[in-house]
Structure formats: structure tokens, C-alpha cells
């Protein structure tokens, strides 16, 4: 959703960057290709770009706890993040808790109006 700087204090912080291959027009669908995979060493950093230019995953492939520091810029005005399921070529929107509650309440009201009418 925004730019970010990712760093690690300990070994074991893996970063995988992806490129989106589809045009984003088909709702719920996203075809991603892995572009690079690397593991940061203590004190190393990397960055991510906003939106589709910065699709990435991070994790710890090892068995020892990794300590990381990730700093992200101000979110764009889109209002949601996108969560990608790489194996299934799927994408769905993730909303902040407050916004999601408002959306759920509006959906419930619409449902009640439809049931009463």
C-alpha cells in the first residue's frame, strides 16, 4: 500500500519480491511471478515500493526467532491492502478494523431492509 524499509537485527529474515503479470481488471484474480528471493543478514536493509510495484512476502524459513524492524510510509488513499494467494492466483481486499466494522454494519442494514421489505 505504501513504500517501506525492511531490516533485520538477527539472521533469518527472508524477502520474496513478485511481479504482477495480469492487468488487475479481473476481480479476485492475480497472476504473480517470483522475481527475487534473498535473506537479509543482521544490519542489512531492503525496500519495497507502493502498490503493485511492491508486492512481496517476508518470513523466517529457519527455526530460530528473527527480530526485524519494518518501517512503512503513509498509506495511500485506496483504503485497503491487497492479500495475494500466490498458489491459487487469487487476491482479496483487507480493510482496517474500523472501516471493516462500518462496512459490515452497512451490509447488515441492507440485509435487514431487504428482509423487511
Task: Give the location of each predicted region.
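Glycine- and acidic-residue-biased ligand/ion/polar-headgroup-sensing regions
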Residues: 1-21
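A short hydrophobic beta-strand segment most commonly corresponding to one strand
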Residues: 5-7, 63-78
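Residue-level signal for secondary-structure boundary sites
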Residues: 14, 46, 76-79
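Asparagine-centered strand-capping/turn motif at beta-strand->loop junctions
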Residues: 57-61
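Long hydrophobic alpha-helical segments typical of transmembrane helices together
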Residues: 84-117
Amino acid at each position: 500500500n505504501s513504500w517501506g524499509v525492511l531490516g533485520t537485527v538477527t539472521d533469518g529474515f527472508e524477502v520474496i519480491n513478485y511481479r504482477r503479470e495480469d492487468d488487475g481488471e479481473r476481480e479476485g484474480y492475480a497472476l504473480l511471478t517470483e522475481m527475487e528471493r534473498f535473506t537479509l543478514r543482521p544490519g542489512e536493509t531492503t525496500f519495497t515500493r507502493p502498490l503493485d510495484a511492491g508486492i512481496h512476502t517476508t518470513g523466517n524459513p529457519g527455526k530460530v526467532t528473527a527480530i526485524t524492524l519494518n518501517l512503512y510510509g503513509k498509506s495511500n488513499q485506496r483504503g485497503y491492502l491487497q492479500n495475494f494467494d500466490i498458489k491459487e492466483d487469487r487476491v482479496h481486499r483487507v480493510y482496517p478494523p474500523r472501516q471493516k466494522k462500518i462496512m459490515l454494519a452497512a451490509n447488515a442494514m441492507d440485509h435487514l431492509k431487504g428482509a423487511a421489505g
